Structures are given as C-alpha cells and as structure tokens.
Amino acid sequence: MSEAGDMGLVVVGAAGRMGQTLIRAIHTIPGARVIGAVERADSPHLGKDAGELAGIGIINVPIGDDPLPVFAKADGVLDFTTPASSVEFAGYAAQARIVHVIGTTGCSADDNARIAAAARHATIVKSGNMSLGVNLLAVLVEQAARALDADDFDIEILEMHHKHKVDAPSGTALLLGEAAAAGRGIALAGNDVRSRDGHTGVRKTGSIGFATLRGGSVVGDHSVILAGTGERITLSHHAEDRAIFARGAVKAALWARGKKPGLYSMRDVLGLS
C-alpha cells in the first residue's frame, strides 16, 4: 500500500481485542495507515510492534504509553477504550487539532459534556455503534416509532453481549432507544425503564424498556420490539464479527479528515442524518 497521502492514525488501547481489530482493519483499507499505538503505562505489551501483536506482521510501530508525541504527528485517533480515557484523549486531540473517532460506551453526561467541549477544536465522531447495519436500523426504528402511536404500540429493546462487557445497557441499545424516543418526539431520559423486579405495576404508556443479557462470546445482538394488541414487530441486528465496528471507525476517520471541528455521529458519516 502506498503511504503517500495516507491518513496517519493512532490506535489507543492498541493491545486489547478491539485495538488489535482496529490495527488489522486499518491495514486492509486504502488511504489509512497506523502511525502510532498507545497502551496503559502498566501494559505488558509496551515496546512490542503493534502490527506483530495484531497478527499482520511487523509495521515498525512500537506500542508506547505517551499519547502526546504520536498525537502530534497524527491525522487522527481511533478510540474504543474507557470513558475516563476517552475524555482524556479528546483533550489531547483538541490540542493537536486532529480527528478523534470514539466508539467507547458507558459515558456519563459529564463525560459527554467534556467530549463536546473538546469538539470545539477537534473533529470528533462519536457513536455507540460504528456499523452501517446498526445505524440503518436506528433510522428504521425512528421511522417505526413515529408511525406507530404510543397508545397502540409499546417499545422494548433487548440486547445481548459477551460476558466480559462491563456496561449496560449497551451503547447500541441506548442509541436505538434515542432513535425510538426521537420518533415519538420525547426525551429518552425520564421515559426509559432499565430494570424490572418484584411488583412493578402495569406498564407506563409511552415508556421505552430495556432488557440486558450477558454470556458467552456474543459480539452483539440487538432487537427493538414494537408490541401492539394482536401483533408485534421486531427489528433486529446481529453482529457476528467486531471487525464491522473497526471498519466503520476507519471509514469515519477518513470521512472526518478535513471536516470542521465539531461533534459528529455515524449518521453524519453514512449520510443518514
């Protein structure tokens, strides 16, 4: 692959499962190349070649623990880490005036506010899911929620992930919940039901329910159920390989290159806004 004009990308969390998947994805997509790899200061993988660790051979990019030097020479950063880390990296991306693609989930309102503040100087693409299929599903969910009256159809969102996932509901489930709420013309906050236990009483009209399953090695299953009297519609997406998220993240970075600073979503990237 020619390096002339390629977008130089840094992968943070480079030794993790998603980090290695991102490195492999960048290696296969024209127009992008890995120029930096960052890990925690206590990572046993510091100093190793990022490409060799990801199984694509030596690419002469050692894994380091200081993001500042590599951000300074990069065009963008791909980030599927933790909320606290993503907030920190957003600040560094703002200093470097580069693209920051965030696939991290579990961010709090304060985390999101700090990321939005960084977007005054960085071009940030943030999404709970980077795949084309899920973002198209979100559009369909919004349309269905708009077309089907809340008095007639209840909305429930069911998701399942592998046993190692630490946040719930998933970022994708919340993305779909936001889409359903937008279709209904309401805010998700205050209308979401995330747990049911004991005597819960009857279902509140217009609420949006979430159910979470964890187990095995499931990459990600999501279903949005619109349940009416005598009929039920289910809109679903099943992720079979986390590489779909990595490819979407690289596509987002390439799309964001040259865009004005701001906070964008995958709907913007895919032209679904």
UniProtKB/Swiss-Prot annotation:
Pfam families: DapB_C, DapB_N. NADP(+) binds at residue 40. It comes from the Bacteria. The keyword Transmembrane helix does not apply. GO terms for cellular component: cytosol. Signal peptide: none annotated. Keywords: Amino-acid biosynthesis, Cytoplasm, Diaminopimelate biosynthesis, Lysine biosynthesis, NAD, NADP, Oxidoreductase. It catalyses: (S)-2,3,4,5-tetrahydrodipicolinate + NAD(+) + H2O = (2S,4S)-4-hydroxy-2,3,4,5-tetrahydrodipicolinate + NADH + H(+); (S)-2,3,4,5-tetrahydrodipicolinate + NADP(+) + H2O = (2S,4S)-4-hydroxy-2,3,4,5-tetrahydrodipicolinate + NADPH + H(+). It is an enzyme of class 1 (oxidoreductase). Pathway: Amino-acid biosynthesis; L-lysine biosynthesis via DAP pathway; (S)-tetrahydrodipicolinate from L-aspartate: step 4/4. Gene3D superfamilies: Dihydrodipicolinate Reductase, domain 2, NAD(P)-binding Rossmann-like Domain. Belongs to the DapB family. Catalyzes the conversion of 4-hydroxy-tetrahydrodipicolinate (HTPA) to tetrahydrodipicolinate. This is 4-hydroxy-tetrahydrodipicolinate reductase 1.
